[in-house]
Amino acid sequence: MADPARARKLADRIKVIVAERLDRGLRDPRLGFVTITDVQVTGDLQHATVFYTVYGTDQERADTAAALTAATGMLRSEVGKNITARLTPTLQFQLDAIPENAAHIEDLLRQARDHDTEVAGLAEGAAYAGEQDPYVKPREAN
């Protein structure tokens, strides 16, 4: 089991290497606008999961996933050339759901804001039922 700090450094290095290689371009027309968001490496440094997002439609996401799967070997050899680890970790690409989750959270926050505005509007014109405040009674001095 490797030191967690070493695993994190290796993950950061893999993220940079893969992102730079994708920035230089692959010869695959299916590859869309890809952003590498994170890399997680197992404790034994044997496997790396590369999380990515794709800007575009569902079809472009599927095409990009196929292109990354096809280019896994080439990207792994690129990683192997640029790291100092004894063994090169296997790469697995996983679509990151951050944009979809963020949009869902933004929608929920908008709904909550709208509901708060509606409640505040109803509270402005509201009055207590009965007296001003039926629970507050003046104290009598003995």
UniProtKB/Swiss-Prot annotation:
Q: Does the keyword Amino-acid biosynthesis apply?
A: no
Q: Which GO terms describe its biological process?
A: maturation of SSU-rRNA
UniProt keyword list: Cytoplasm, Ribosome biogenesis
What the entry lists under InterPro entries is as follows:
KH_dom-like_a/b, RbfA, RbfA_dom_sf
Gene Ontology terms, MF aspect: ribosomal small subunit binding
Q: What Gene3D superfamilies does UniProt report for this protein, alphabetically?
A: 3.30.300.20
Q: What is its main location?
A: cytoplasm
S-S pairs: none
> May I have one GO cellular component term?
cytosol
Q: Where is this protein localized, as stated in its record? A: Cytoplasm
* Role, per record: One of several proteins that assist in the late maturation steps of the functional core of the 30S ribosomal subunit. Associates with free 30S ribosomal subunits (but not with 30S subunits that are part of 70S ribosomes or polysomes). Required for efficient processing of 16S rRNA. May interact with the 5'-terminal helix region of 16S rRNA.
Task: Tell me its family.
Answer: Belongs to the RbfA family.
Per UniProt, subunit arrangement is: Monomer. Binds 30S ribosomal subunits, but not 50S ribosomal subunits or 70S ribosomes.
By what name is this protein known? Answer: Ribosome-binding factor A
Q: Which organism is it from?
A: Leifsonia xyli subsp. xyli (strain CTCB07)
Gene transcribed to yield this protein:
rbfA
